[in-house]
Amino acid sequence: MLAKFGLCAVFLVLGTAATFDTDPEEASPRRARFSSNSPSDVARCLNGALAVGCGTFACLENSTCDTDGMHDICQLFFHTAATFNTQGKTFVKESLRCIANGVTSKVFQTIRRCGVFQRMISEVQEECYSRLDICGVARSNPEAIGEVVQVPAHFPNRYYSTLLQSLLACDEETVAVVRAGLVARLGPDMETLFQLLQNKHCPQGSNQGPNSAPAGWRWPMGSPPSFKIQPSMRGRDPTHLFARKRSVEALERVME
């Protein structure tokens, strides 16, 4: 339980600047259309892309529907594939193919509305990870999964969030592996935060919620951030965690 709570701290820190409780369909005018590619262009690209490799996910990049992110995850898996064992190599190949096929098969049903399209991609991603046993792969390939589960170079990345949440649903041992990998990359400050959070135990019946901080701790913005960590993609806010940053920035530009 402590390991899972510690991993939640990663969401807390990485999502602070990117999360606000807004309606996903009204978050920003940018969600109403694609920038470089129209919906028909995106659909055509997806239908013409090969299911093997990262071509399918390249079709999702650079759009105002904020569907960027899966291409980066795909490349991370491919770059680290050689370090996985046989089970892991199979997972890399089959999970990417599963997600690509799932997204392509449902694109025409969902692409007219950004929120529905985003949610569909995340649901397909989570379903493929679960079906192909991402937890077992992470347990038997701790170093390789640690290379994959690193902070993305560009935010927001809602699909990185889905990857982390899929691992967070695993057993304690797997969660501990993911946590250790993130701490190693984020440095001693993250380890200190884990310790602060893990040393603060709330008794049953306490009024303290998950945003309560240990004595002496101050949130950088004066109050804890508001965000959602949801156990399943079913009914999940498609703009969770990192996904809202660009929408908020765009809204601010419009209001200036």
Swiss-Prot record:
Produced and secreted by the corpuscles of Stannius. GO terms for biological process: calcium ion transport; intracellular calcium ion homeostasis; negative regulation of calcium ion transport. GO terms for molecular function: hormone activity. GO terms for cellular component: extracellular space. InterPro entries: Stanniocalcin. The keyword Translocase does not apply. Glycans are attached at N62. Keywords: Calcium, Calcium transport, Disulfide bond, Glycoprotein, Hormone, Ion transport, Secreted, Signal, Transport. Residues 1-18 form the signal peptide. It comes from the Eukaryota. Its main location: secreted. Residues 19-33 form a propeptide. It is found in: Secreted. Belongs to the stanniocalcin family. Homodimer; disulfide-linked. Its primary function is the prevention of hypercalcemia. Upon release into the circulation, it lowers calcium transport by the gills, thereby reducing its rate of influx from the environment into the extracellular compartment. STC also stimulates phosphate reabsorption by renal proximal tubules. The consequence of this action is increased levels of plasma phosphate, which combines with excess calcium and promotes its disposal into bone and scales. This is Stanniocalcin. The lineage of its organism: Eukaryota, Metazoa, Chordata, Craniata, Vertebrata.
